Amino acid sequence: MKKNALINAELSYVVATLGHTDEITICDAGLPIPDETQRIDLALIPGVPTFIDTVKAVLGEMQIEGVVMAEEFAQVSPDLHQALIALIRNEELLCGKKITLSYVSHEAFKVHTQDSKAVIRTGECTPYANVIFQSGVVF
C-alpha cells in the first residue's frame, strides 16, 4: 500500500497497486529476473543507483510487514546487510509495527522472486544485495 510521492512512474504505479501481502523485490545488478515478472530496471552504471538509496525510496512509499533476504547476504556483505537492517528497524519505529525478517538460501530467494509483482533492478554490485518486501497496510 502506497504512503507518499515517488518520481519514478513505473515504480510508483507498482507500489500504488500492491495489495496486502503482495511482494516486490529490490535487487543488485546481477540477480536473474524471471521472464514472467515485471522488471523495473533503474540501473544506469555500476553503483547507480545504490541498493540502499533504492530501499530508502521504496520504504518512503511502501508500507511493509515482512522482509525476505538470502542467508548469504549477512555472511558475504555484512556492512550492507547491517545498513538494510538499520533501515528496517527505523521503519518499525516510524510505523509502530513489527516487521518480520526471514532468511532463505540464495537459490530459494531466486525462486521466491517469481512471486513478486515486480523486481526493481539497481546498479548495486555488492554480492547478495537483494531483498523482498511484503506489503503491509497503513491502518
UniProtKB/Swiss-Prot annotation:
The keyword Glycoprotein does not apply. Its main location: cytoplasm. Its EC number is 5.4.99.62. It comes from the Bacteria. InterPro entries: D-ribose_pyranase (IPR023064), RbsD-like_sf (IPR023750), RbsD_FucU (IPR007721). HAMAP family: D_rib_pyranase. Homodecamer. This is D-ribose pyranase. It comes from Photobacterium profundum (strain SS9).
